[in-house]
Regions:
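Hydrophobic alpha-helical core bundles mediating ligand binding, dimerization, or RNAP-core interactions
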Residues: 22-25, 42, 62, 86-90, ...
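Active-site neighborhood of HAD-like aspartate-dependent phosphohydrolases
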Residues: 1-43
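Asp-based, Mg2+/Mn2+-dependent phosphohydrolase catalytic module
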Residues: 1-4, 9, 100, 104-107, ...
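A metal-dependent, Asp-based hydrolase signature
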Residues: 32, 46-84
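Short, acidic loop-to-helix structural element flanking the phosphoryl-transfer center
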Residues: 59-60, 78-115, 125, 153
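Short helix-capping segments at alpha-helix termini
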Residues: 30-31, 72-79, 109, 132-136, ...
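An amphipathic alpha-helix signature
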Residues: 22, 35, 39, 59, ...
Length: 222
């Protein structure tokens, strides 16, 4: 099997570390664990809209899910201020420690690097600039331009079309099994980043590669 020419990265949790979002919730008086509930809730709603043939921006869903979760909690500030503080945390996220080395190694191998996120490219731009890796990426793609969220086939088809390659000439890198499954069904090769050593769900199509860190990626697809 030939080496894929385009490496497509998911962004949220795959490259960016969402752990600090828990502290943002704590700073407004909400339990830290509500950060994970919030992120899962906004993904759920995005998937539901996609299944219904509709779409919405990540930021709008994030704010809506956040207001629902914060309702009734004894916050340390008013709801509008709490929402602004938490949503602002996305702009200050950093990449996981294994990401810069992995990105540099792949770039040095000659692979074309792009992103495909359910979020916004503006957030990715800022995170990558701080990490010093923005110049390694040919394009930062978002489903906002595809008109459909991952894991719908159209999202991956949009990335392939934009990069002028066949889906089989791309490898999707993600921590989310649902993203791996969606990409596989759309014809892409896949690499699952399993930093926490969790079992892969048997009801999803299995990844072509399983790695513990992005820094291992060049060794399997580069």
């Amino acid at each position: 099997m030939s080496t894929p020419s385009v490496v497509v990265f998911d962004v949220n949790e795959t490259l960016s570390d969402l752990t600090p979002m828990g502290q943002r919730f704590a700073e407004v008086g909400a339990p830290e664990w509500t950060a994970k509930l919030w992120f899962a809730s906004l993904l759920r709603d995005g998937f539901a809209l996609t299944a219904a043939g509709a779409t919405e921006r990540f930021s709008a869903l994030g704010e809506g899910a956040l207001r629902s979760i914060l309702a009734g909690l004894p916050l340390s500030r008013d709801t509008d201020a709490a929402v602004e503080h938490i949503m602002g945390g996305f702009l200050e996220l950093q990449v996981h420690p294994d990401v810069p080395e992995g990105v540099r190694s792949l770039s040095a191998s000659g692979a074309r690097l792009v992103t495909l996120t359910n979020g916004s490219t503006e957030v990715a731009e800022g995170i990558f600039a701080v990490a010093g890796i923005r110049h390694h990426f040919e394009r930062l793609l978002s489903v906002e331009d595809a008109g459909v969220w991952k894991p719908a086939p159209g999202a991956y088809a949009y990335a392939a079309s934009t990069c002028s390659v066949d889906p089989a000439d791309m490898v999707l890198v993600a921590v989310h099994p649902w993203d791996i499954d969606g990409a596989k069904r759309a014809g892409l090769r896949t690499a699952w980043v399993n930093r926490e050593g969790r079992p892969y769900p048997g009801y999803f199509l299995a990844p072509d590669h399983s790695i513990a860190a992005v820094s291992e990626l060049a060794g399997v697809v580069g």
